[in-house]
């Protein structure tokens, strides 16, 4: 089934891309959700007419994503957690915790943009992949330190 994407979907393509998907996926998900339209002759002609506008929008989104990626690379992310003497954490650091730490430094991201295969369970420096846009990602080192308790 040939469709034209109305918005960027990370697994399929960018807005305005002509894609070929299985009929069930297109009919049951993409079309009802308004994420795509059928690639009829009139829709393809409309796409070609709006191509310059779509390309400008994509360029703007990419520029914003690259600025955020540069800002993330310059950041020093330190998260304090309760830890035992052996360096293991009581609990773990998840992508939600990383998202909250970034929000404290005025970088607002969705927790789904932070790719963390497993929660961090030890005091360590761990590289974490953050997807800030379509095919724009950066790696941030998250330093987990023991919470300093003052008696």
Curated annotation (Swiss-Prot):
Pfam families on file: Ribosomal_L9_C, Ribosomal_L9_N
Keywords recorded for this protein, A-Z: Ribonucleoprotein, Ribosomal protein, RNA-binding, rRNA-binding
Which SUPFAM superfamilies did the record assign? L9 N-domain-like (SSF55658), Ribosomal protein L9 C-domain (SSF55653)
Task: Return the InterPro entries for the record.
Answer: Ribosomal_bL9, Ribosomal_bL9/RNase_H1_N, Ribosomal_bL9_bac/chp, Ribosomal_bL9_C, Ribosomal_bL9_C_sf, Ribosomal_bL9_N, Ribosomal_bL9_N_sf
One Gene Ontology CC term in the entry: ribosome
Q: Which GO terms describe its molecular function?
A: rRNA binding; structural constituent of ribosome
Q: What are the GO BP annotations of this UniProt entry?
A: translation
Query: Quick check: keyword rRNA processing in the entry?
Result: no
Q: Which family does it belong to?
A: Belongs to the bacterial ribosomal protein bL9 family.
Briefly state the protein's biological role. Answer: Binds to the 23S rRNA.
> By what name is this protein known?
Large ribosomal subunit protein bL9
